[in-house]
């Protein structure tokens, strides 16, 4: 699907999902990778994974600003692939799938990750020339 106007933001999606009674968790990709790494260090990864498995919608935002080492990539893959047939995941990024090689070191893992992300999914191309935030700010006056 392609959406020509950028009217939908993460905040709106979270609000609407919560109002509909869904359990939602929002992370930036970097924060999720950091929380997973911290959970491993604190010996509480299984607790975090169990917590994430109980939510209806996991939103991972900004998957394009920093690269992930092999370990971080593996942990992100584990979380995303575990949810692939069981619960919803929204990933926002300004990169096409072909550009994800810039983010992840392991190309085989990346291929499996993209396969998990795209299986039975809707891919929305929301790249547009205008910005909802900028338009909203300019029209606020």
Stretch-by-stretch model annotation:
Residues 23, 56-57:
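The start of beta-strands in P-loop NTPase/AAA+ ATPase cores
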Residues 15-27:
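Post-Walker A helix-loop "phosphate-sensing" segment adjacent to the P-loop in P-loop NTPases
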Residues 11, 15-18, 84:
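Residues within alpha-helical segments
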Residues 1-9, 13-14:
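Single conserved hydrophobic/aromatic residue that forms the stacking wall/gate
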Residues 7, 52-53:
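A short, aliphatic-rich alpha-helical micro-motif
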């Amino acid at each position: 699907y392609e959406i020509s106007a950028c009217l939908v933001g993460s905040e709106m999606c979270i609000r609407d999902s919560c109002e509909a009674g869904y359990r939602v968790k929002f992370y930036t990709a970097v924060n999720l990778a950091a929380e997973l790494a911290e959970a491993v260090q604190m010996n509480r990864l299984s607790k975090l994974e169990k917590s994430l498995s109980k939510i209806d919608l996991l939103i991972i935002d900004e998957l394009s600003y920093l690269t992930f080492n092999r370990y971080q990539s593996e942990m992100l893959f584990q979380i995303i692939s575990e949810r692939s047939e069981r619960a919803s995941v929204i990933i926002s990024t300004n990169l096409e799938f072909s550009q994800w090689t810039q983010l992840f070191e392991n190309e085989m893992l990346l291929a499996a990750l993209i396969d998990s992300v795209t299986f039975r999914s809707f891919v929305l191309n929301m790249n547009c020339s205008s910005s909802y935030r900028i338009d909203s700010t300019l029209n606020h006056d």
